[in-house]
Amino acid sequence: MESITVFSAGSFCYALQELSDIFRQIHHIEIKAFCGPAGILRQQIEQGNRGDIFISANPGNVLQLADSKKIYQKLTIAFNQLALTTLNLEHFRHKSIFELLFDRSFLGVKNVSKY
């Protein structure tokens, strides 16, 4: 079976797995995915590791590869957005979300479950 090698930022790993399964069923081509920090994957490509596709949420990584002539072409296919919210509780209503972000007393997790 033919294969495509993909270096992907860890944040895209779960979506890549789902897309890989569908792609394999339709095209009968295996996706070999290597997921991790995009900066480290970029360094591996710069050092000679070969892949067919590189996925990074940080356009700087892609630009570095383009500048060093390590990639043939680049394409932005999506943009991230960050949404911030708070619970509808009285003690959150007296500060803006940005104030809460920098107030360490509000940034804590009391109950963390094991995976």
UniProtKB/Swiss-Prot annotation:
SUPFAM superfamilies: Periplasmic binding protein-like II
Any single GO BP term: molybdate ion transport
Any one Pfam family match given in the protein's UniProt record, by short name: SBP_bac_11
Any one annotated GO CC term: outer membrane-bounded periplasmic space
Name the UniProt record assigns to this protein: Uncharacterized protein HI_1469
Superkingdom of the source species: Bacteria
GO MF term set: molybdate ion binding
